[in-house]
């Protein structure tokens, strides 16, 4: 079983627990997730099954964004008006320094920060640079809350943005709820619940609901190998870049998805005058005849 499941993670469950659930359900050992969601958060959690796990590094780059919708709740004598919050949010857009919450899923010495915090340990998350594309504030709620949609890059912590928004407006704030609506090409409207996935598995139809290996990497350039290079492709031999249309025009080191007769064969990168394989993933019908680099 190879491909992606777009799972709707429920709140109160870790991303690792979702992976364990899918692993037990399918009997497939090679299962992972692409983009951690904190336990309290809900929303899109792409699950990689089988050979799809080898594509993790190509799924999301700096130009891809994820939509996150959350609420903040602020307390204090001088509650900021809506326009003040909108103005403050402008300072949190672009490349910003961020210190994730100690209740995040970031691991320190192999243990998630939220576990260390709950165990009473004195922990502090490292500062990192993240990219925030946009922050859109929607309506206020009667209980001093505000709903907002954030488009951001990989590794951004929405809880920290809520904290920072409170600091900028001079009024303590915290995140009340987070729903990730999109991660790369994986969207909320196409996500399935864990119960739905289990039902498909029980019916023997889960395989038909798997997204193909190249589903999450459509943002990467494509290279089509001619049929006469089939032997080199099957053997994982580097390919002459000038024989693949458009490859020589790509920047040095650019990763591309390689196709042969419109079938996805894996990822390679331009190195000088050659296209060098980084991840050979032959179609299942060809797998026994291919040598993996």
Regions found by a protein language model. Give the residues of each.
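Accessory RNA 3′-end/elbow-binding domains used by RNA modification enzymes
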Residues: 1-10, 14-41, 71, 168-293
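RNA pseudouridine synthases
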Residues: 1-192, 267-268
